[in-house]
């Protein structure tokens, strides 16, 4: 983004410091493009700092349309089902970077676990399970548990059950009355 060249202002890994761009501009190259944007993806919170060839890109997490995402305040912050993941993953990756503490938990129930991509099945994935929402709220590291329970309660009441779920199309299954619809 625009702050890539200002190390103290930058959201990035420690290796992305703009050296290549600086070398090119020092030699006369001009810069173009979207300096205020980025192509980010939702990534495993506890992934290593640099690549693991055995894992490849399995640290990415793109099954969010089948669940919800919550931030540190315990609240949803995006319409996870606005479109298919191919059209939203980079946009939502950036949105996650703008959340408090730059993370989000993805929440799924047992009805959709068979739909999750293989990247959710690697042994390095951070995963917690619980028998109740209250129990889950205590296991989500960095999340306000009281707000999370409230958010899930509102979510569960808002989900339309009169429309059959079909994961292969925009089926019209949605919510009613939430600040951020799905």
State each model region's role:
Residues 1-11:
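Single conserved hydrophobic/aromatic residue that forms the stacking wall/gate
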Residues 5, 19-20:
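Extended, hydrophobic alpha-helical segments in both membrane/secreted and soluble proteins
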Residues 14-17, 25-182:
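Mobile, glycine/GP-rich and aromatic-enriched active-site lid/loop segments adjacent to catalytic centers
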